[in-house]
Amino acid sequence: MELSIEEYRLTKNLSYRILEKNNEIVKIEFRKNSEVTEIKEYKYINTYEIYRKIYSEEKVDLSNCYVEDFSLSKYRKYIGADRVDEVYIKEFMAKETFFVSDEYIDFSIVKFEQKRVVFRDSIFAKGKVNFDKANFGEGNVCFNNVNFGKGSVDFKEVNFGEGNVCFDKANFGEGQVRFDKANFGDGNVSFRMAKFGKEYVDFMSSNFGKGNVYFGLAKFGEETVNFRNVNFGEGNVYFDNVNFGKGNVDFCVSKFGKGDADFSNVNFGEGNVDFKKVNFGEGNVNFNNVNFGDGNIYFNKAKLEKGEIDFQNASFGKNNIFFHDVRFGEGNIRFNNSDLSTANIEFSDCKFENDVDFRFKSCKSLNLKDITNKQTMNFRFENNKPLKWFKFKNLINYGRIEIDLKQSNFKNLINKQNSTYKEKADQFLILKENFNNLGQYDDEDEAYVEFKRCERRSRYTTFTRKLNPLYWVEVMLFDWVGAYGTKPYNVLCTMLLTIIGFATSYLYIPTMCINFDNSKITNEIVKAIYYSGITFLTIGYGDISPQNEITAMTSVIEGFLGIFLMSYFTVSFVRKLLR
């Protein structure tokens, strides 16, 4: 007989209605997206019969049963116990059970005494689910494929004992989910393919033991996911392929042990991601192929001991990524082929104990501030000019910086910074010393020239630069002529142009007067070049001498330039030759 046409929603797409109900059976029709998927028959069991079995310490087997308004709080009143007294259940089984209540389905402050507790394939419909401070004993706990419906789910301060805990494919409905301060014991813990609803999910201050922790392919909803201050124990931790939804994700102050932490292929959605003060332990940390969305990302004061941290092929949105005072430990740091085309990333007060791979696919801005580098920082990009903005300040380099100055466009990136010329000069000086150590002498020369230019500009304001003649003398003699001693070819060309220029003045300016009486040279042009050359190179006239004051003073000027430029050329050439 059909008792009810009313349809009750379990989740967004799943609903049910009771077709038949009596003291023996309950027949329920399940629908998905308004299509009938199953009609299932349950055995009806009176709630007070369950209470009697618990009180008599009999086995409680609710498998394939319809259970209505079950509440251990009501049971305590029924037997006259205090509301905080622990309820002991000798043996318990609830496979494919249908729990329903208009208020709470209450298993709070219960202790299961057998070695295995099973709720597999059960449904908690309509009511809120409360396992607050439950103790699951020493055995395995199975909530595989459980559907928790629309209400909140509370496993706060639960003790799961020493066995394995499994919530694989569990659907936590649409309400708030709480596992805060839960103790998961030393077994493996699995939430693989679990689905959390729209509300807040809280694992704060929970404790995992020696086993592995699995959240692979789990899906979270629209609110904050809180793993703050969680102890993930000594095993491996897997969050691979998790979708964290739209809310913030908080792992702040959590601790990982000896195992690896795998966040590969995770989608962090639209919220902020917080790993501040996280201790990642001794294992590797994998963020390979992660999508971080548009929220800000914080790793401030995080700690890695021995493992590497890997962001290869990761994708970042319109966000800021902060690594402040991070202790990176002995492992490598990898960002190769990661996409930060709309993201800003900043490292400050960090020590790089091992290699760092900054070969981004693209990056909007990279800021390195107060960094100590002990090994290799790699900027040898596969793509041309992937960085749009770059700055490092107070970098202490004990290792090496692998970079191609031209290919990476670092020179232009530093020059266009909105910082002082002194800060720019310091950056070029670090690069100059680094290239010298690596034997990249062409890059060293280029960095040195930029260092001297920024150092020169730092001594003058924009206004005084234009008016100060000493500034322009330095620009012309040291920069334009020989690029601060890095280009002997330029100095040589300047020497030749100087000789020809003065020869032209001796030849064509009327006031110039030179005595060629003792010379056997008859060609006037050759005479002028000869006089200019010996004046420039030797300051000795021999058979030719100036005949008036203007010519004599011009010869003095050329002689001085000759001494200066020849010395400049010698120093520049020898510097190149010795290297």
Model-derived features: where do they sit?
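Membrane-interface junctions
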Residues: 461, 479, 483-491, 556-559, ...
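Pore domain of cation channels
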Residues: 517-579
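Hydrophobic, well-ordered secondary-structure elements that form the walls
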Residues: 444, 505, 573
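Alpha-helical structural motif
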Residues: 94, 107, 469, 473, ...
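N-terminal leader/targeting and pre-domain segments
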Residues: 1-473
